[in-house]
Swiss-Prot record:
Taxonomic classification: Eukaryota, Discoba, Euglenozoa, Euglenida, Spirocuta
Gene Ontology CC annotations of this record: chloroplast; ribonucleoprotein complex; ribosome
Plastid is among the record's keywords: yes
Family to which this protein belongs: Belongs to the chloroplast-specific ribosomal protein cS23 family.
Annotated organism of origin: Euglena viridis
Chloroplast is among the record's keywords: yes
Quaternary structure and interacting proteins, as annotated: Part of the 30S ribosomal subunit.
Record key words, sorted: Chloroplast, Plastid, Ribonucleoprotein, Ribosomal protein
Protein name per Swiss-Prot or TrEMBL: Small ribosomal subunit protein cS23
Role of this protein: Probably a ribosomal protein or a ribosome-associated protein.
Recorded GO MF terms: structural constituent of ribosome
Gene Ontology annotations of biological process type: translation
Amino acid sequence: MQKFVLKFLWLQRSVAVSLDQKIGDNVSPLTEFYFWPQCDAWEEMRNFLESKSWINSSESILLLNQVTEIINDWQEKDDSQRKDIFDLKEKFPFVDFIGFD
């Protein structure tokens, strides 16, 4: 069972990520949205994960790798490619894309 959920806003000019924790059937937000490229969303997420002793290093690495993959995917696409939401959800099934423009 997945313990954490990454949520993404997939926008034309930026991508944003937040982290939620799953507890049973409930989901509780742990972070605000960190926007990239306005700030270093990856670094902000890393700082958050490192500050929580109850999140182990293997979970942190997995989450940060997923953030890296999605930010890289966003960077590699032009504006028209960023609109292909179905491809995105297929490529990254373990994260939630909750907003698009």
